[in-house]
Amino acid sequence: MVLNIKAPENIVLKPTITVFGVGGAGSNAVNNMISANLQGANFVVANTDAQSLEHSLCTNKIQLGVSTTRGLGAGASPEVGALAAQESESEIRSYLENSNMVFITAGMGGGTGTGSAPVIARIAKELGILTVGVVTKPFHFEGGHRMKTADKGLIELQQFVDTLIVIPNQNLFRIANEQTTFADAFKMADDILHAGVRGVTDLMIMPGLINLDFADIKAVMSEMGKAMMGTGEASGEDRAIKAAESAISNPLLDHSSMCGARGVLINITGGSDMTLFEVDNAANRIREEVDNLDANIIFGSTFNPELKGIIRVSVVATGIDADKVPTYKPAIAETTNIVPEETYNEPIVQPTQIEEIPDFNSYSTENIEITDSPINQNFIGNEKELGLHANSFNKSEDDSPKPSFLGKIWGSLRASNNQTLERKNIVVNTLDQDNKESDIHDIPAFLRKKRD
């Protein structure tokens, strides 16, 4: 009897993380991560454009929809992109089967990324893989049609991913300047994906005092909806606080606030000189941003000898409540109910038939007495500026002048209590031709003034 005694195989069990680039934008993001020598992840690119695949640095390539597109691209049609991914479903599934977590990166608004990314996410979910979407939205100069296409693609993609991170390309103008090249600007957006993947892989493969396992990460990111990722590095005085603040204030993300987050993953990495107080300061600074007392906050700390003198803080906040996220609203988008000012219409002048015009020359002016009082010079010529109007004056039976033939045409005006006007008063005393009342004459209407 022969006994075969063998040493047990040393099987290393570790989670497999796959970064899946879809379309032109997704392929470029993967190229940037490969160039940065990102460790701990597998890379796959898929595209309908055969020429783009040839220039990819990734070794795992999928030509989507060979029969559907013949390698010529999706022609900016999401429907064609979806059909191409469905045609290549078996090949996509083979690259995803052994993965525990997948990052799907694509650009929304085109044909391949918008149409194929949701199909790939659906396949990943069917395989029980933790799925994270990291996608970009078009620039404003790309037009409204492309933006609407992107929004539809986001709605479709969100149905199949556990966590979704959206990076509007327009936000690149927040950090770019006149010397920033087009390639460098897109690399800034790709750095968000790079930092997110690195933050997860470092927690699982780097040595540290507080290590996290994949179950911890899954608890924070599974079925959490919209999320934000951020990373920050700092050195010198207060480096821990500065790195934490840089991580939680990413200008490229739409939802760059952690308000209302239901899950938070914190990774603090530094060299051998990182102190306990620095770790405490960085972690507490991030916790201050979370106003949800029931949030699941998972913390890890690792060492990296390459970061001597530097502290790096990576944050993944998931389940962000959109109602609590402060978003920028341009002034032109705000509407205000404007109550129109009250308008006053000029009184309609009804012409009065003049039966007889008196002969003014027949009246004597020898005993006319004229009394002047000061006039408010500010009033003259400024009736419109003062807001005075014919309807602003009130007329009463007691103090109104008696009607005359001119008064019937012009009306009699009396200033309101708030707009009292000192007028020039002309007091005319004449003898009454008919001797009806003492010795006062009957004065013409344009000279008549009621006596006090």
Swiss-Prot record:
PANTHER family: CELL DIVISION PROTEIN FTSZ-RELATED (PTHR30314), MITOCHONDRIAL DIVISION PROTEIN FSZA (PTHR30314:SF3). Its main location: cytoplasm. Essential cell division protein that forms a contractile ring structure (Z ring) at the future cell division site. The regulation of the ring assembly controls the timing and the location of cell division. One of the functions of the FtsZ ring is to recruit other cell division proteins to the septum to produce a new cell wall between the dividing cells. Binds GTP and shows GTPase activity. Homodimer. Polymerizes to form a dynamic ring structure in a strictly GTP-dependent manner. Interacts directly with several other division proteins. Keywords: Cell cycle, Cell division, Cytoplasm, GTP-binding, Nucleotide-binding, Septation. Gene3D superfamilies: Tubulin/FtsZ, C-terminal domain, Tubulin/FtsZ, GTPase domain. It comes from the Bacteria. Pfam families: FtsZ_C (PF12327), Tubulin (PF00091). GO terms for cellular component: cell division site; cytoplasm. InterPro entries: Cell_div_FtsZ (IPR000158), Cell_div_FtsZ_CS (IPR020805), FtsZ/CetZ (IPR045061), FtsZ_C (IPR024757), Tub_FtsZ_C (IPR008280), Tubulin/FtsZ-like_C (IPR037103), Tubulin/FtsZ_2-layer-sand-dom (IPR018316), Tubulin/FtsZ_GTPase_sf (IPR036525). One of its GO terms (biological process) is protein polymerization. GTP binds at residues 24-28, 111-113, 142, 146, 190. It is found in: Cytoplasm. GO terms for molecular function: GTP binding; GTPase activity. This is Cell division protein FtsZ. The gene is ftsZ. The keyword Nucleotide-binding applies. Belongs to the FtsZ family.
